[in-house]
Amino acid sequence: MWPHVSRPEDGQVTEIVAGLYMSPLELLALLCAVALVVARWLPAAARPRVTIAAGTVLLLSAIVLFVVGIRWQMLPVLAGAALALPFALAPLLRHRTGRPAWRARWWLALPGSVACVGLIATAPVTAWAFPVPVFPEPSGRFAVGTRVVQWTDQRRPESFTTDPHDRRTVVVQLWYPAQKSPQGAQRAQYLGRTEPEARTVSAALARQVGLPGFLVGGVTRAHSRSVFNAPVAGGGGRFPVVLFSPGSGGVRTQNTAWAEELASHGYVVAALDHPYDSAAVVLANGRTIHSQIASTGHRDKDEELAVGWTAVRAADLGFVLTQLDRMDRGEITGPLTGRLDTGRVAVTGHSIGGAAALQAARQDRRFDAVIDLDGYPHGPTSPSLHQPTLALTQAITPSTDPRYLPRLSKALKLSTATGYRLTIPGAAHLTFMDGPLYLPPVPSIVGSLGRTESPHVVAATTLAFLDTTLRHEPGDMADILSAYGDLSVYHPDNSR
C-alpha cells in the first residue's frame, strides 16, 4: 500500500535516501573516507590520484555537512578518515621532497586499516538504527494539508495549576484533504511548526524515556508528506472527522504517518496536545509547557492517577469536537468552514489516549465510532459504549499486564454496538505510532513488522473500520480484520 520512497523534495544532496538512511553527501563522504583507508593498499601508480581525489572531496563534503548541520553518525567517518589521512599523505609528501617514500609495514598497517574501516562502518549502522524518518507516501487520491490551531475552554479551569483564572488550553493539529501543491513545495516539519519547536519537543520526548537527545536528533530533520496551510481540496464535499489523543507523554504529531494516510482518503484528522501531560507543548505565544505527570510505581495509586488523567483527556476531546463543529458553522474562521462533517466523527487514541477515547465516547454521543490503539481502559466501564469500537492490541507476551485483555474485553462486551478486538502478531506497543520509522528496529521496542509494514497494518485496519462505520461502505468487517491477526468480535447480544 505504501512504497517506502523518498520525499518529493529529495534529490538535494542533503536529503535522506530512503532505504540507505543517509544523504547523497553523507554517502559520498563515507566512500571517500573508505578510499583514503584503502589507498595504502593500491598499486603505487594509483595511490596519489586516489588519495588526492578522495581527500579533496571528503574535505569539501565535510565543510558542507558542517554548514548545513552534521549528524552525529558522521563523526566516526571523519574520525576514521583523519586517522588514515597521515598514512595516506606521508608517501606523497616524502616523494615531493625527493626523499624515499615511506610506508608502514603491512603487518602494522593492516590492523590500523581494519580499525579505521570499522570506525567508518559505524556510520551506516547507527544511521540505520537511529534514522531520519522518511514518511510513507499516502495512498489515497487526495494530497494532504496540515495546520495548527490553539483553543481555550473558558468554561473549564486548568486542573494542573493553582491559578484560579487559568483555563484549559489545547493545541490541535489538523490534517485534511488538500489540493495538490506545486512540485517541490516545502513539506511540513515533523514534531512542530518550526525546527526550533521540533527540537524542543524531541528533547522533551528523549528526556521522558531516558535517552540522550542526540540519539534521536534525526527526527528534527524530518519532513512529513503534508504541506502547511495547503488549500483544502475542491469539490465542496464534507469530510468525516477523526479525533486523536496520543499516548502518555505523547504529542499531537506522534501518529503523523497514520493521520496523513487517513487524510489522503478523505478524512480530517484532529490530533491533540494535552498540556501538562504531553512531553512538551509549545503555545502560540512561544511558552513551552512540559509534562507534569509521573507514575509512582504503586499499582493502585498509578491507576487512580491514570483515571484522573484520562478524564482530563476525555474532556479535551469533547471540547475539540465542539470547536470543530463551530469551525464548520463559521463561528471560528478557517479554511475548513463548511467542509467538516461533524455528524460522522470517530474518537481515537493510543495507549492512555485510547482509554481517553473510550471514556469520551461513553460521555458524548456525538462520537459515532471508537478506535483504541493498544490502550488499557482506565476509569469506569459505565455507562456502556454505544458506538462500534475497534481495539488493536500488541502481541500478548508473559510481560503483558494480565489485567489488560480481560478489562478491554469487558468494555467491549458491555457495549450496545459491535466491537472488534484485533491482536496483531509481531506488534509492540510503539508499533501503533511513528516509532518504527525512527527508532531501532528492536522487536521489544517497536515490534517485528518492520518500518514499512508497521504503518501499513495500522492504517489498513483502521481505515477499513472507519470506511465501514462512518461511510457505511459495504464489506465484511470481520473478514477484513481477521487477515491481519487474531480477531475477537463482540456483539451486543452475545460475544465470541
Please place each PLM-identified region on the residue numbering.
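The feature captures the conserved acid-bearing segment of alpha/beta-hydrolase catalytic domains
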Residues: A233, D368-H429
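Primarily recognizes the serine-hydrolase "nucleophile elbow" in alpha/beta-hydrolase
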Residues: V320-S384
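Alpha/beta-hydrolase active-site loop
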Residues: Y276, V282-R339
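Domain-level recognition of soluble alpha/beta enzyme cores
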Residues: V125-V242, R451, T462-A464, R471
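Active-site machinery of serine-nucleophile hydrolases
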Residues: A178-Q179, A188-L215, T253-R299, P425
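Short substrate-entry loop that stabilizes the transition state in hydrolases
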Residues: A222-F239, F244-V282, P398-D401
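Alpha/beta-hydrolase-fold serine-hydrolase catalytic core, especially in secreted/extracellular enzymes
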Residues: T14-V117, W128-P138, G145-T146, Q154, ...
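Glycine-rich His-Gly loop
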Residues: Y176, F244-S248, S351, Q394-A395
